[in-house]
């Protein structure tokens, strides 16, 4: 889930048009769920892989309406935009090439619906906290310090540092 929050220092200043420009090498259909959610469900031209892109806007203040596959946000104080995407591709290390569904997995429409519903209940701050926790767990596993003694050299003027280097 990608979460983007738009806000302003003054109330009622968020006026947005949200739409999705589909992949040009696919055939699909845009559907609307309520007045604040878009779903693009499509098949790629070259391999018929199904994919889905779902966009939901959650407003504080103002209004959201749907206009032919576009979400129109008017006079909102804040807008949270959630985006989910998925394909039906399934890794298969022992494929049966006679089976046309050998690489077809889960339904991307159902997956994106489940993910966006879960994210919608959390709010931006909780999503951000979960992102930090996930990110920190992955990227704080390693630390690297090069030449701790160099910290004292940072106080020296550049010309002295260059002289030491030569």
What are these regions (language model features)?
Residues 1-166:
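Aromatic-residue-lined binding/catalytic grooves and analogous aromatic/hydrophobic interfacial grooves
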